[in-house]
A protein has these predicted regions:
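A short, glycine/Asx- and small/polar-enriched loop/turn
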Residues: 6, 129-135, 229-234
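Short, well-ordered beta-strand elements within core beta-sheets of diverse protein domains
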Residues: 24, 52, 154, 235-242
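Active-site "cap" helix and flanking loop/linker of ATP-utilizing ligase/carboxylase catalytic domains
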Residues: 103-125, 131, 140-198
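Generic preference for hydrophobic
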Residues: 12, 50, 72-75, 136, ...
Length: 275
């Protein structure tokens, strides 16, 4: 009924999963049945959310909450692709959105944290910058995933967010939240076409490139690569850092070009992806 009554486009998703599992864009009414089934299969409780599609750049925000204070630590630009699914293929930190928009997003994030009653600990938010202003996609009582709180933020600032969050959990005041430097850190996923991985080459050479901080592989030769419909099942990641945004992105692209993932025995999904 919600799909019939609400204006298109819409987004349907499970209310109790993670990693964009079961999240899908509905652009036409006839797409609703399949999207409903996919979301239902990904839901632990069977409960779903149908909401407006929010068009615009997406931000990822982290915050620490302690001593009655909300300290927003970092804001990154998320790159979402693979419509009608919502797959994060990477992020760049810090965001290069106008400061005025970042201020509005920060205000909304802090208001949402208070509304949820998160008065101690950590919080992460995904916020869209729409033509009508910032809108909340998700708020959670934890630090961000996707390598942001554990890799890109520490690499860009020198601040260990995980340590700070643990200190708060122990009832202590974080001791080291002041930025030591102001770099740009970039994370991008390695996403081959679907099929069976025959070989992975060039990883050691990629790691030797100046500015490459991490090359992380979650798959190896013999594993299968499926078509990505969520943030689960990626083959690997490259994380880089530099003094400028352009340089950090350039280094990341070079590292990923250095790595060769050879695919054989293509699955039936391969040709859909290529088309």
């Amino acid at each position: 009924n919600a799909v019939k009554e609400m204006p298109l486009p819409l987004v349907i998703k499970p209310c109790d999963n993670m990693g964009a599992r079961g999240v899908k864009l509905i652009s036409e009414r006839h797409e609703a049945s399949l999207a409903f089934r996919e979301a239902k299969e990904a839901s632990i409780s069977g409960k779903l959310i149908v909401e407006e599609y929010m068009d615009g750049p997406e931000l990822s925000l982290d915050a620490l909450i302690f001593n009655g204070h909300i300290q927003v630590t970092g804001i990154g630009d998320r790159i979402i692709q693979r419509a009608p699914y919502f797959v994060e293929v990477g992020h760049t930190l810090p965001s290069n959105q106008p400061q005025e928009k970042l201020n509005l997003a920060t205000e909304l994030f802090c208001s949402a944290i208070k509304a949820l009653g998160i008065d101690i600990g950590a919080a992460k938010g995904d916020i869209k910058l729409t033509k009508d202003g910032p809108k909340v996609i998700e708020i959670a009582a934890r630090l961000s995933g996707g390598w942001m709180s554990t890799y890109t933020y520490p690499l860009a600032t020198g601040v260990n967010l995980m340590k700070a969050a643990i200190e708060i959990a122990l009832g202590e005041t974080p001791t080291d939240l002041k930025k030591k430097y102001d770099f740009v850190s970039v994370e991008r996923a390695i996403i081959p076409i679907p099929g069976k991985i025959l070989t992975i080459k060039g990883v050691d050479d990629a790691r030797k490139i100046k500015g490459v901080k991490e090359v992380i592989f979650l798959k190896e030769a013999g594993d299968s690569v499926e078509e990505l419909r969520s943030n689960v099942g990626k083959t690997g990641y490259v994380i880089t850092v530099a003094k400028t945004r352009e340089e950090a992105i350039r280094i990341n692209e070079l590292a990923r070009q250095t790595i060769q993932v050879k695919i054989g025995e293509p699955s039936e999904l391969t040709w859909d992806v290529l088309r």
